[in-house]
Amino acid sequence: MSLVAIGINHKTATVDLREKVAFSPDKIHDAMKSLASRTRSGEAVIVSTCNRTELYCNNGDEADIIEWLEEYHGLDHQDVAPCLYNYHGQAAVRHLMRVASGLDSLILGEPQILGQVKQAFVKAKEAGTVALTIDRLFQNTFSVAKKVRTETEIGAAAVSVAFAAVSMAKHIFSSLSTTKVLLIGAGETIELVAKHLKDNGVASMVVANRTLERAQSMCEEFNATAITLAQIPDFLPKADIVISSTASPLPILGKGMVEKALKQRRHQPMLLVDIAVPRDIEPEVADLDDAFLYTVDDLHSIIEQNKASRKEAAEQAELITEEQSYLFMDWVRSLESVDSIREYRSQSMAIKDELVERALNKLAQGGDTEQVLIELANRLTNRLIHAPTQALTVASRQGDLNTLGQLRTALGLDKN
């Protein structure tokens, strides 16, 4: 067993590169099957969010996995390699546990990443790229993340990218209660944004989504108006704040659309926060007067303040993930010992079956019973002690007292 984790995140790469290596929801199923085919175990999970893309594989070659990632997205090695990080074995286990617990998030302790990791695991199971080791790894990880939440204050006054987006709006507008907000998307992040906006007194919200039914379902909770993406040009001029987070592979708001809306607003300022990867809003929008565009990479000041308040809780959480990653590796080693024992027993039984069959044939041919049994016992003894005898001889000749002592203990020669 050899667990490998390879990834890229907000710490190692810009949003430009992150969106190039992101996997869209409609393609991730086939992508995981393709990745799993490059491993010896057929096990792989891809975690792809706005802030990270990570590949978790069992019995995969690091160089081969990186090559697959570059080939899949059509990227040059020199552009991707400097931004990649990789972990093996226990380090890979701990990294996944840290990610799921929110310890590696843009906003320390944010809870949404756990749901995203769970969703990635479900998709991997649907793709048939999960077996014993990866299944146990992710199930343990979910338990560890829950343990971190219940035993530390990492989740106190929970924040997220959504919270940071709303916090930025509060810094720009003296009062959110009089602002009109357009939310694009209806996923978990936008739902959190809507919750934070409502908590801050926003009464006028419009939710635009590809499927109107999903937007309507969300709007019921927040007393908002649901529209389709095609209706955005009609509602954009009325919006003081636009926050977007969809899984669209192409931008939803272009410079021309925003420029037209600003003219209709008579150049009243508009705050646009794009927390999607790939980006929902064309970067050129930032060139427009009266348009203030921010992406996830612009939220660092809020995030740094959050990190300071959660440092102590994070230290406690780090100890939990370290301990639990060691416990998981103990299970892995026990699994490997079970395989070794099963193989050793199978080998011994095969020798026994071979020699017993030979003895029975001799008896059937009229051989002397006592002589056949003595010969069977001698041959069986010699075959079974052959490998241990060779190992003892090699250890003795090499002066390897440690191995020699372990062999003597294993063979029951040193009994205390």
Swiss-Prot record:
<keyword id="KW-0521">NADP</keyword>
<dbReference type="GO" id="GO:0050661">
    <property type="term" value="F:NADP binding"/>
</dbReference>
<dbReference type="InterPro" id="IPR036453">
    <property type="entry name" value="GluRdtase_dimer_dom_sf"/>
</dbReference>
<keyword id="KW-0560">Oxidoreductase</keyword>
<dbReference type="InterPro" id="IPR000343">
    <property type="entry name" value="4pyrrol_synth_GluRdtase"/>
</dbReference>
<dbReference type="GO" id="GO:0008883">
    <property type="term" value="F:glutamyl-tRNA reductase activity"/>
</dbReference>
<dbReference type="InterPro" id="IPR015896">
    <property type="entry name" value="4pyrrol_synth_GluRdtase_dimer"/>
</dbReference>
<dbReference type="Pfam" id="PF05201">
    <property type="entry name" value="GlutR_N"/>
</dbReference>
<dbReference type="InterPro" id="IPR018214">
    <property type="entry name" value="GluRdtase_CS"/>
</dbReference>
<keyword id="KW-0627">Porphyrin biosynthesis</keyword>
<dbReference type="InterPro" id="IPR036343">
    <property type="entry name" value="GluRdtase_N_sf"/>
</dbReference>
<feature type="site" description="Important for activity">
    <location>
        <position position="95"/>
    </location>
</feature>
<feature type="binding site">
    <location>
        <begin position="49"/>
        <end position="52"/>
    </location>
    <ligand>
        <name>substrate</name>
    </ligand>
</feature>
<dbReference type="InterPro" id="IPR015895">
    <property type="entry name" value="4pyrrol_synth_GluRdtase_N"/>
</dbReference>
<protein>
    <recommendedName>
        <fullName>Glutamyl-tRNA reductase</fullName>
        <ecNumber>1.2.1.70</ecNumber>
    </recommendedName>
</protein>
<feature type="binding site">
    <location>
        <begin position="110"/>
        <end position="112"/>
    </location>
    <ligand>
        <name>substrate</name>
    </ligand>
</feature>
<comment type="similarity">
    <text>Belongs to the glutamyl-tRNA reductase family.</text>
</comment>
<dbReference type="InterPro" id="IPR036291">
    <property type="entry name" value="NAD(P)-bd_dom_sf"/>
</dbReference>
<dbReference type="GO" id="GO:0019353">
    <property type="term" value="P:protoporphyrinogen IX biosynthetic process from glutamate"/>
</dbReference>
<comment type="function">
    <text>Catalyzes the NADPH-dependent reduction of glutamyl-tRNA(Glu) to glutamate 1-semialdehyde (GSA).</text>
</comment>
<dbReference type="Pfam" id="PF01488">
    <property type="entry name" value="Shikimate_DH"/>
</dbReference>
<feature type="active site" description="Nucleophile">
    <location>
        <position position="50"/>
    </location>
</feature>
<comment type="pathway">
    <text>Porphyrin-containing compound metabolism; protoporphyrin-IX biosynthesis; 5-aminolevulinate from L-glutamyl-tRNA(Glu): step 1/2.</text>
</comment>
<dbReference type="Pfam" id="PF00745">
    <property type="entry name" value="GlutR_dimer"/>
</dbReference>
<feature type="binding site">
    <location>
        <position position="116"/>
    </location>
    <ligand>
        <name>substrate</name>
    </ligand>
</feature>
<feature type="binding site">
    <location>
        <begin position="185"/>
        <end position="190"/>
    </location>
    <ligand>
        <name>NADP(+)</name>
    </ligand>
</feature>
<comment type="subunit">
    <text>Homodimer.</text>
</comment>
<feature type="binding site">
    <location>
        <position position="105"/>
    </location>
    <ligand>
        <name>substrate</name>
    </ligand>
</feature>
<dbReference type="InterPro" id="IPR006151">
    <property type="entry name" value="Shikm_DH/Glu-tRNA_Rdtase"/>
</dbReference>
